[in-house]
Amino acid sequence: MNLHAAYIDYALRRSQHMQAEMSGADNVLLKDYQLFVAKVFLGLDSMNSLLLFQETGVGKTVTAVYMLKHLRFLYTSWTVLVLVKKALVEEPWMNTILRFAPEVAKDCVFMNYDDQNFHNKFFTNIKTVSARSRIFVIIDECHNFISKSLSREDGRARNTKHVYNFLARHIASSHNKLLCLSATPIVNNVREFALLVNLLRPGVLPPQSLFHNKRLLDEAELVSKLGCICSYLVHHEASIFEDVEGSELFARKRVLLKYVRMSAKQEDIYHKARAAEFRSGIAVFRVHRRMAATFAFDEFPVRKNLTPDEYDALVASLVRDFEALFAGRALSDATRARLRAGEPIECAASAEDLSLYQALYEHSCKYAEVCVAILASPGKCLVFEPFINLSGIRIFVKYLEVFGISYIEFSSRTKDTRTRAVAEFNRVENTNGELIKTCVFSLSGNEGISFLSINDIFILDMTWNEASLKQIIGRAIRLHSHANNPPERRYVNVHFVVAQLGSGAPSVDDDLLEIIQNKAREFSQLYRVLKLASIEWIHQHCREFAPVDDEAGFRALCSRAIDVTRGASTRRALATGENIWYAFSTLMITVHPGFKTEDGRVYDADGNFLTTMPERPIVRVQGTRLVYIFPELR
């Protein structure tokens, strides 16, 4: 990697005239890490692509705009194509450009990759690009673009894949540039890593699997051939299920699993939802169970023999019945005051209020318990609920009203008002939630926005992957996001709210937690590759190089094919030792059977080597089990 380091050194020398201040209608002083990335990417003309793998809140947009402002350092004529979700065009992109680099606005063409007609608009715009102009492409939240480029289940290519193929073929040619931005570049499966790499470095990654028994075949080969593929700035490398200590820049994170038992009515509806999924053949998606584990109407709405309009009318009537049942009802001021003081509901509530609470709990153990926890929180709260209508946010806000909790909503229902509402929520005067206590948000709010001074986040329903959950949590733990809080309140408690069945059988929430953890094991290995191949890691750790005076060999260095044909060798042997239990997190979401040999080697149940037992292992007790914790295996 020393040769990569030599080219980074060359880029920094060539771009040393670039200053940290960026001025337009407003001024901003770039952080050292932002200026470093810009100097390297613009200092190497033949560095055609770069991934900004940087966590939320560190200024990826500002870094990208700074690059646009200094493009003429390389060449006089550029066309800038910004591929972005529609919700993020005005804020942060256009706002940042107009504040700090208004002169480049005329060169920028914004296209929304979440537009159904995106591919046609893209190729229409490409045809208008002058032959004399170079192209600078920015893909914001590139994991979304990549996921839209994956083939469908039936093997048919999506329209976005045509845009992907064009970029892979043409951007790496000549002297065009491609900048991809993401805090979570891999979201759903490892195929996304292959697509991302072959977009940034076309043709270097072979079609063979990179894994054997969920372990990377050759980390060193990947790191060597992918040198300088990205900028890596991730302060919180730990799993979302691990606690993270705070720093001067970031708040402390503590993770809590909040188990709540379904009422008899909710559990009955849950089992009906499960049966309906299996009858209709959609059990794999778990949609009905997820909704029932969150909220249950008086009856389960069955689609059978109903037209779509009839089914919608049935659900609407159930919603109206629920809203009518609790219309005008609210907990007393005295009960709310005791709940804010931290008293349990059984002690805090009068007989009338307790009856009201139990009626709410009967429909949703999650909603009722979370409202109690919000009142007890000393600061502001976020509540994530992906479902909006039916039994989702529309119902949850009724719970907030009964509990007397002030709130804003950030979802597709509030497109016209949500940006202003977040600004009010983030005001210094509302640091402790005096004006607005809670923000309820859907997946609309997991990218591109910041929430300040949050003390508690409640995850009411699991997503299918850790990356989405990281984005959600990252909305509240950002650079200087808790600067207005006193030191003792610079923390964020993340509550994963898990519905439990009375029988003790795993619920849909338990299933999703296990799926998330299994995916995360492979993702974390690929993230480590990106870290070790990043320009920051190479610049800091590879110092034994001879300076270069040009970049003639850089493109060839980055075009070498990756060889993963060596595969994984397997050797059979008889070992003596003992059976053990192990987990990847102290939360022990999933506990696995394993085997420890007499010399301390640890294997999984299939005999695959995992790790060597440390001298002072982390051990936890779960029921009658002694469980070893191996967080490094994630």
UniProtKB/Swiss-Prot annotation:
Please list where the region (Binding to the cap-specific mRNA (nucleoside-2'-O-)-methyltransferase) is annotated: 456-523
Q: Could you tell me the keywords of this UniProt record?
A: ATP-binding, DNA-binding, Hydrolase, Nucleotide-binding, Transcription, Virion
E.C. number: 3.6.1.15
Q: Name the reaction it catalyses.
A: a ribonucleoside 5'-triphosphate + H2O = a ribonucleoside 5'-diphosphate + phosphate + H(+)
> Record keywords: NAD included?
no
A Pfam family matched by this chain, by name?
Helicase_C
**What function does this protein fulfil?**
DNA-dependent ATPase required for providing the needed energy to achieve the termination of early transcripts. Acts in concert with the RAP94 subunit of the virion RNA polymerase and the capping enzyme/VTF to catalyze release of UUUUUNU-containing nascent RNA from the elongation complex. NPH-I must bind ssDNA in order to exhibit ATPase activity.
Protein name in the entry: Nucleoside triphosphatase I
Native organism: Molluscum contagiosum virus subtype 1
Gene that codes for this?
NPH1
